[in-house]
């Protein structure tokens, strides 16, 4: 199979995006200045979809080892094999840390995976999701039905639009939890890592409300993590913690999360008080594959080099 950059749908944005991805004879490779000197490649069996939305290039391909793969602007977003490690952790780390969450907002997450996980919590009455790119939602429903199954939940309200603008219009104290499933801090997603955005989240949360946001890799992005931690400690007057999980197809094989709470009822993220089990949620959803209470607690254990840096930002 011979496929070039032009045919993978990435060429139109090459000047706009610093990512350099390609499908060469039988292989997809992802390269970025965020992880210089290395690349991650997956063998391609078949390209299933290529399209260009108003915001980005979208591609789906069948890999030989990780099932179907969703790629946005040349960056792997999820694979069928390991998406559970990300979706389950970014969702249940916050929601299992507070009693009876009722209103949840998801920023990004157009593939529907976070929605699927939120729907496991029977106490939740309202799930709002704000995704900027309608094509991502449509592609996920067509090619990743086991991920996008969350959209079938009647508690879900989908808003197509900019998450930053959406948050600015949310009445103060609306949500028990906000989950930010963002891409890397390049281009439009840069706003989702900056102080004004975190301030908007804090305003939208009730006292003792929680936020979980994608927070990069300790192996590649400590300088970004330092800034995120510093901003969060200024804004969130409850708890501020960094946790992580393993995702083989993400750069360095892991990804982190910032877990923060607003001033109010104390939140101890490291000790889940609202546990779920393998059978939680609608019958249309498969049992948990990754998350459990033990891995919840373990996810906050950091290697010494990262622990020193993160703790120093709290002084």
Curated annotation (Swiss-Prot):
GO MF terms held by the record: spermidine synthase activity
All copies of domain PABS, residue ranges: 25-262
CC per GO annotation: cytosol
Residues engaged in binding S-adenosyl 3-(methylsulfanyl)propylamine: 56, 87, 111, 131, 162-163, 181
Enzyme superclass (EC): transferase
UniProt xrefs under InterPro entries: PABS, PABS_CS, SAM-dependent_MTases_sf, Spermi_synthase, Spermi_synthase_euk, Spermidine_synt_N, Spermidine_synt_N_sf
Listed CDD domains: AdoMet_MTases
Protein name as catalogued: Spermidine synthase 1
């Amino acid at each position: 199979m011979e496929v070039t950059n032009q045919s993978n749908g990435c060429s139109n944005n090459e000047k706009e995006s610093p990512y350099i991805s390609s499908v060469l004879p039988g292989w997809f490779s992802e390269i970025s200045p965020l992880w210089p000197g290395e690349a991650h490649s997956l063998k391609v069996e078949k390209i299933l979809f290529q399209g260009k939305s108003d915001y980005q290039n979208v591609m789906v391909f069948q890999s030989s080892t990780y099932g179907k793969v969703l790629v946005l602007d040349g960056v792997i977003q999820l694979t069928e094999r390991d998406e559970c490690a990300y979706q389950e952790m970014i969702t249940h780390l916050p929601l299992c840390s507070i009693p009876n969450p009722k209103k949840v907002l998801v920023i990004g997450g157009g593939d529907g995976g976070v929605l699927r996980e939120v729907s496991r919590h029977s106490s939740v009455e309202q799930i709002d999701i704000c995704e900027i790119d309608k094509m991502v939602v449509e592609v996920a429903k067509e090619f990743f039905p086991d991920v996008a199954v969350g959209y079938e939940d009647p508690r879900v309200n989908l808003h197509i639009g900019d998450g930053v603008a959406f948050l600015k219009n949310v009445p103060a104290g609306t949500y028990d939890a906000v989950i930010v499933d963002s891409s890397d801090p390049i281009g439009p997603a840069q706003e989702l890592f900056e102080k004004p955005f975190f301030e908007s989240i804090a305003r939208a949360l009730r006292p003792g409300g929680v936020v979980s946001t994608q927070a990069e890799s300790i192996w590649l992005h400590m300088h970004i993590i330092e800034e995120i931690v510093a901003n969060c400690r200024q804004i969130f007057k409850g708890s501020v913690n960094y946790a992580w999980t393993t995702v083989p197809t993400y750069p360095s094989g892991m990804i982190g999360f910032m877990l923060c709470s607003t001033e109010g009822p104390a939140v101890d993220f490291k000790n889940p008080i609202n546990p779920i089990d393998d059978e939680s949620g609608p019958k249309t959803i498969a049992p948990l594959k990754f998350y459990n209470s033990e891995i919840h607690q373990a996810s906050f254990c950091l290697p010494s080099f990262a622990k020193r840096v993160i703790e120093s930002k709290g002084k």
